[in-house]
Amino acid sequence: VDVFEDGGLRVFGPRKNAAILEGSKAFSKDLMKKYGIPTAAYENFDDPQKALAYLETAKFPIVLKADGLALGKGVLICNTLQEAQEGVRSIMMDKKFGSAGNTMVIEEFMTGREVSVLSYVDGKTIKTMTSAQDHKRAQDGDQGLNTGGMGTFSPSPFYTKEVDEFCKSHIYQATVDAMAKEGREFKGIIFFGLMLTKDGPRVLEYNARFGDPEAQVVLPRMKNDILEVMEACVDGTLDQVDLQFEDNAAVCVVLASDGYPVSYEKGYVIRGLENFKDKDGYYVFHAGTKKTDKGIVTNGGRVLGVTA
């Protein structure tokens, strides 16, 4: 974004100094603490020995988070001291996620319903989109390893009017204002990963971009022209936009390669895409695919997202 702006181009998205909201979990946790935005209790560590010592007195389960970007896989939920010690060693000492693991956030484990809320931001004004609920486990019945997301639906039945009002008062605008006060004006998309706990909504994480597969159920329900909304964010006129969504629901199921998220083969031909031609209200979103002479083939872990 910085490079484009330096070249005199209009671009939608946060500058580097604002994208740190997602780029560093330690930064975002410290920001929430400073400005009173509700989140889980936590400590930051850049010394693995101090992290290991802290775990000796911690309550379990506990959550370990690599500070930097780790393709959505840098979060470990540890039920025992031994699991947590192994997590610290693999992330901080063995550098499983490279420099993303130089600093680690260790935070309390929160229970409740997870909800995702995407929003447009123009630096001052924030307009939230409809809610979505993501399912991260690789296998049916909420089993298996955590992934980048295996499917999602929108809206979330747990995101009630009361929850929305609380988040508007204590989380959404507060985050935008906090970034502005820090001299890091945020323009673009803020994705709020929320946990609806018995004590009220808490922020799990921020992303500085659309969620995948959340965008695949939220955007098809949006009535506005997306380009007009993005231009309003760039121009700082988002307050003049009336963001509207269809009063319906959408579901997205991710088709993934066998063995994802651990190891999987690529290069299988995908058949049946033509069945979606002229089908209104059905979408196939490509992710890990590649065009070849023999047709479109699988080329990643999460291959397609099918939305209805």
Model regions and ranges:
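A short, GP-enriched loop/loop-strand-helix hinge that lies immediately N-terminal to
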Residues: 1-23, 37-46
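Short beta-strand/turn micro-motifs at beta-sheet edges
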Residues: 139-141, 240-242, 289-296
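General beta-strand structural signal in soluble alpha/beta enzymes
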Residues: 11-14, 41-44, 62-66, 77, ...
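Short, well-ordered beta-strand elements within core beta-sheets of diverse protein domains
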Residues: 152-155, 253-254, 302-308
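Internal nucleotide-binding/catalytic subdomain
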Residues: 74-217
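Generic C-terminus detector
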Residues: 289-292, 298-308
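Active-site "cap" helix and flanking loop/linker of ATP-utilizing ligase/carboxylase catalytic domains
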Residues: 168-190, 207-279, 287
